[in-house]
Every structure is written in C-alpha cells, then in structure tokens.
Amino acid sequence: SLSTETLFLKAWKILVALGFLAVFLLLIDANILGHGARYGSLSTYLVFNDQCGTSRGFIWRRSLELFSHFPLSHKLFGFGPDTFGILTTRSAFKEMIAATGQIFDTAHNEYLQYLLTIGPIALIAYMIFLSNSCQHMARYVLKALITESTAVPYAIGCLFAVICYGFQAFVNLNLPIITPFLWITLSMGIATVKKYTVHKVK
C-alpha cells in the first residue's frame, strides 16, 4: 500500500498540474484562438498585447525580438550583465517612447532579463538550481510533517518564500533590496534539509 507521504505528494502534483493546465488552456483560448472578449474583465490578465501589464507586453515582445537577432555567441552567453538598457536604447529608443512614453532599462521579467544579459545556459542553470532546491525542501517538509518535526514551520516558510519569489519574478526584476532575502531564505531552507539529512544518517 502507498504511504501517506506518497499519497500526499501525488495529490499535490496532480493539483499543481491541473492548475497549470487550466491556466495554459485559458491563455491558448484567449490569445491563439482569439476568444479573449468572452472573459470580460479577466481578459486584462489573459490577453497578451503591448499594453498588458502596464506596457510589459511591449518590452517582453521587444526582448524576444532582440534575442532572435543576436549572433550565436550572444544567444549562448548573453549580451553581458546589466546591459539590457544599452540594448533597448540602442535599438528601440524611438519605438519605446512612441508606444509607451517611457524608457525600459529592464525587461520587468527576471527570466527574460537573464536570457538577454547572461544567456540561456546561465538562465537554465539558475532555474535548475532553484527548482532542485525547492524539490529538496518540499521532500523534507513532507517527511517532517509525518514525523512531526519542530523544524517544519521554518522549512515551509523558506520553501514558499522561494516559490513566491520565483512566480513574482515573471513580472518583476531583481532588486538589491529584495534579492538578498531570496538567497538568505534559500540558504536557510537548504541548511534545514542538510541538518535533517545528517541527523537521519547518524
């Protein structure tokens, strides 16, 4: 028979998968199939155009266009750290002003920002590191809940802090006042997992 931990984990996986599938289907219907109007006020969030997200749609589109015109070396390793503003002002300054009335020196999407500045190799490595860290913390939380470990609240807090940061990074940029807290909570979560693993081995 399946253990409680396994059943709990499978239930969460199914729930998360169904949630992502529902959002994916809504986006397909609203954008590719052109049925955005049927969602009423929700179309503001579902339909992607240059005006969505306070003009984030514009800079996201231009970011992907800029990346598509990169030479091979830049497509692999990016244009250089913190050079997004140079890219946009050099190639899309007039278009930015005409379309949005402002200048974008960031992509307002941390993953797009990394894609253009440090390249897909570094971006993939970063995302794998975050996802693996969350996976290790999630496994610990499930085991700790069953064993009623006193460290559960700390582990849950660290896990969801990292997950929330990962989701908000789709519409924001990494800031010096915020990003250090990601690494602090991530380190605390991993340290908790390591401590639990060491005690278990002993």
Where are these regions (language model features)?
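Transmembrane alpha-helices of multi-pass inner-membrane enzymes
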Residues: S1, F129, M137, L145-V201
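Membrane-helix boundary/interfacial segments in multi-pass membrane proteins
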Residues: V47, C52, D105, E110, ...
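A conserved mid-to-late transmembrane alpha helix and its immediate loop/hinge
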Residues: L76-F77, E95-M137
